[in-house]
C-alpha cells in the first residue's frame, strides 16, 4: 500500500490512514471478544476512524513537511557576531517544493539571499551554496581526464548541475541520466 499511498496521499495522510485502519482492526478484534452489551459499540468503529482521519488533517499541517525533512546541515562561513545575527542566519528556510514519492520524500527549500537546496529524505543532495563546486567538479573532472569523451552517464539527477557541466565539453554529445525518483526530476526545475 505504501507504493500507492505515499505518492497519492503523501506521508502525513498515509500515516493518518494507516493508524486509522490499525485502530479499526484493533477495535473489531476487541469487539468480537467483548460482552454482548459492549458489542453495540461496533457500528461506531467506522465513524470513529473517519473522524480520526479528519482530525489528523489538522495535526499534520504545512509545517509537517518541513519538520519531517529537516536534516542536519551547517552553513559554512556564516559565524554570527550577535545573538540577533545568529537568529537571522538560523531562521527556518522557506519550503518551495515538497512531494512524497514511493521511493523518497523530496523537498526544495530556500534560505534568505537565494540559497536554494534540494533534499532527498532530509539529506541535502544539491544546493546553490558552497557545495556548487563539488557538483561542477563531478562533471568536469571525468570529462577532462578522458582523452576523447563522447558520452557520459550520471547516476542521480540532483539539481542537474553535473549534467550541465558535462555538456560544456565540446566532445560530449550525449549525457544519459539515471534517476530513481520522479520527484527529484520535478524538483530540479527550481
Language-model features: locations:
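Alpha-helical transmembrane segments of multi-pass membrane proteins
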Residues: 1-190
Amino acid at each position: 500500500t505504501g507504493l500507492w499511498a505515499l505518492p497519492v496521499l503523501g506521508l502525513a495522510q498515509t500515516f493518518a490512514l494507516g493508524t486509522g485502519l490499525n485502530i479499526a482492526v484493533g477495535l473489531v478484534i476487541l469487539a468480537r471478544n467483548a460482552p454482548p452489551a459492549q458489542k453495540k459499540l461496533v457500528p461506531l468503529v467506522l465513524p470513529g476512524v473517519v473522524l480520526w482521519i479528519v482530525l489528523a488533517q489538522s495535526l499534520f499541517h504545512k509545517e509537517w513537511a518541513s519538520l519531517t525533512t529537516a536534516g542536519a546541515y551547517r552553513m559554512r562561513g556564516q559565524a554570527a557576531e550577535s545573538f540577533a545575527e545568529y537568529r537571522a542566519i538560523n531562521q527556518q528556510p522557506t519550503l518551495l517544493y515538497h512531494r512524497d514519492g514511493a521511493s523518497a520524500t523530496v523537498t526544495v527549500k530556500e534560505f534568505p539571499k537565494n540559497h536554494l537546496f534540494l533534499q532527498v529524505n532530509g539529506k541535502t543532495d544539491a544546493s546553490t551554496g558552497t557545495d556548487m563546486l563539488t557538483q561542477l567538479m563531478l562533471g568536469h573532472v571525468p570529462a577532462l581526464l578522458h582523452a576523447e569523451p563522447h558520452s557520459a552517464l550520471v547516476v542521480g539527477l540532483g539539481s542537474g548541475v553535473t549534467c550541465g557541466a558535462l555538456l560544456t565539453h565540446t566532445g560530449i554529445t550525449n549525457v544519459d541520466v539515471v534517476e530513481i525518483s520522479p520527484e527529484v526530476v520535478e524538483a530540479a526545475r527550481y
